[in-house]
């Protein structure tokens, strides 16, 4: 139950971001470096995703027989096709910003170090024109909060059944991440 409660709290955060917090604004994510799992899902919940060239993206959950449960399928489908969504979610490899741009998953790739300026440029010059189009995108392909809730319930049920080998692998990956920070 605790896992489900925490998962639903994460869903609330990405859903509110996707819905622009109920305000007339555009949410933008800037990706610098590796963007994996839940971090990638959080970025995808923005209306606009800008990445620096060296950024890499992926869903490593498949390595431990899980799938990303915080909206990956829902958000990728609203940017691309079911085929691309399934390819991304079932592949543990990291993909470059350029590859993500080609697949239609992100909106803009800029040189390393130019991300903050690109976000400012977008907000100053392109956002006023794009706001209406982004609203149309949400209308044509709406996201119902229940969709995210149902997926997180499936994720929790799946996570509760993972085996010891997968738990050990997760532990090793967490330990390696901790060494990086």
What are these regions (language model features)?
Residues 3-4:
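Short, small-residue-biased leader/transition segments that mark boundaries at the very start
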Residues 10, 25-26, 171:
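Acidic catalytic patch
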Residues 37:
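A donor-sugar binding/catalytic signature common to diverse glycosyltransferases
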Residues 18-34, 45-56, 63, 69-127:
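Crotonase-fold acyl-CoA enzyme core
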Residues 113, 121-181:
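C-terminal alpha-helix plus adjacent terminal tail
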Residues 8-15:
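A glycine-rich, hydrophobic loop/mini-helix early in the fold
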Residues 40-41:
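Active-site-proximal alpha-helical scaffold in enzymes
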């Amino acid at each position: 139950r605790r896992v489900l409660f925490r998962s639903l709290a994460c869903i609330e955060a990405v859903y509110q971001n996707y819905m622009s917090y109920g305000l007339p604004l555009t949410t933008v994510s800037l990706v610098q470096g590796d963007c994996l799992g839940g971090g990638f899902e959080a970025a995808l919940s923005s209306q606009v995703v800008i990445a620096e060239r060296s950024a890499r993206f992926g869903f490593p959950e498949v390595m431990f027989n899980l799938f990303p449960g915080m909206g990956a399928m829902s958000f990728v489908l609203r940017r691309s096709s079911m085929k691309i969504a399934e390819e991304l979610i079932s592949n543990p490899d990291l993909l470059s910003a350029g590859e993500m741009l080609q697949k239609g998953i992100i909106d803009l790739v800029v040189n390393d170090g130019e991300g903050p300026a690109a976000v400012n440029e977008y907000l100053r010059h392109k956002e006023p024109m794009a706001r209406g189009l982004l609203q149309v995108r949400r209308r044509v392909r709406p996201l119902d909060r229940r969709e995210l809730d149902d997926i997180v319930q499936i994720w929790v049920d799946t996570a509760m059944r993972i085996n010891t080998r997968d738990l050990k692998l997760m532990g090793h990956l967490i330990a390696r991440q901790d060494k990086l920070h």
